[in-house]
C-alpha cells in the first residue's frame, strides 16, 4: 500500500478529507464528558432508564449518563425500527423504509446480557473507544484504525437509536456518522497533515526487515 496520495487527488480533496477527519474527531470529543469515568454519568447504584408502552405511547423513567442511553436502547430494542424512511406523498405511512428490528433486538440482547450487568467495567470500554477515536483522528495517528473503530461505534449507535420516537433521535444524524466513519477508513486521512505521514515510511523500513507487526500497523495508517 503506497503512502502517496491516490492518483488524481487534488489539494481541495485533501483539505476536504482533513476537515472531515477533524470534524468527526471533535464530534467524539464532545461526547466524552457527559459519560466520563468512573461513574459514566450514571446515578447512584448505576440505575438504568426503564420504560413501558401505555396506550401506544412510550413512558420512560429516565436516569442519567451512559445508564440513561443504554436503558433507552434496551427499551426500544423490542419495537419495530424502520430506518431510511421516505414518505413520497407526505400522507399516511412512509412508502420506503428498511426495518432493522432484528438488528435492534440483537443489540438489546447484547446490552441487557453483557453491557448492563457489567457497566462498572464495560463503561470504560465504551469511553475508551470514543477517546481513542478522538485521539486517532485528531492527530492522524493510525487513522484507518480510528475510522474502523468509529464505524463500529457509529453502527451500534445507529442500530440502537436512529429514528426512535421518545426521545426523538433524527435518524440521519447516525447515518451521517456512519458514512463519515466509512470514508475515514477508506481514505486513510492521517496521511495528510497527520502523524501517519511521518510514521508510514518508518514502518515501511521495518517491513522490509521482516517485521510483521510493522506490516499490520502500516495497514492501519
State each model region's role.
Residues 1-132, 139-221:
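Extended, low-polarity transmembrane helix blocks
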Amino acid at each position: 500500500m503506497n503512502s502517496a496520495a491516490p492518483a488524481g487527488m487534488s489539494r481541495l480533496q485533501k483539505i476536504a478529507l482533513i476537515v472531515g477527519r477533524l470534524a468527526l474527531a471533535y464530534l467524539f470529543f464532545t461526547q466524552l464528558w457527559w459519560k466520563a469515568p468512573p461513574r459514566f454519568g450514571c446515578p447512584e447504584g448505576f440505575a438504568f432508564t426503564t420504560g413501558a408502552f401505555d396506550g401506544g405511547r412510550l413512558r420512560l423513567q429516565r436516569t442519567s449518563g451512559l445508564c440513561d442511553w443504554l436503558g433507552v436502547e434496551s427499551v426500544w430494542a423490542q419495537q419495530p425500527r424502520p430506518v431510511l424512511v421516505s414518505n413520497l406523498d407526505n400522507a399516511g405511512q412512509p412508502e420506503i423504509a428498511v426495518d432493522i428490528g432484528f438488528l435492534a433486538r440483537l443489540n438489546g440482547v447484547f446490552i441487557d446480557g453483557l453491557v448492563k450487568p457489567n457497566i462498572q467495567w464495560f463503561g470504560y470500554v465504551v469511553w475508551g473507544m470514543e477517546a481513542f477515536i478522538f485521539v486517532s483522528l485528531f492527530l492522524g495517528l493510525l487513522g484507518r484504525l480510528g475510522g474502523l473503530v468509529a464505524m463500529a461505534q457509529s453502527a451500534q449507535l445507529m442500530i440502537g437509536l436512529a429514528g426512535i420516537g421518545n426521545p426523538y433521535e433524527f435518524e440521519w444524524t447516525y447515518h451521517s456518522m456512519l458514512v463519515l466513519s466509512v470514508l475515514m477508513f477508506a481514505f486513510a486521512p492521517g496521511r495528510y497533515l497527520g502523524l501517519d505521514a511521518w510514521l508510514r515510511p518508518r514502518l515501511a523500513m521495518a517491513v522490509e526487515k521482516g517485521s510483521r507487526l510493522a506490516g499490520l500497523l502500516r495497514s492501519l495508517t
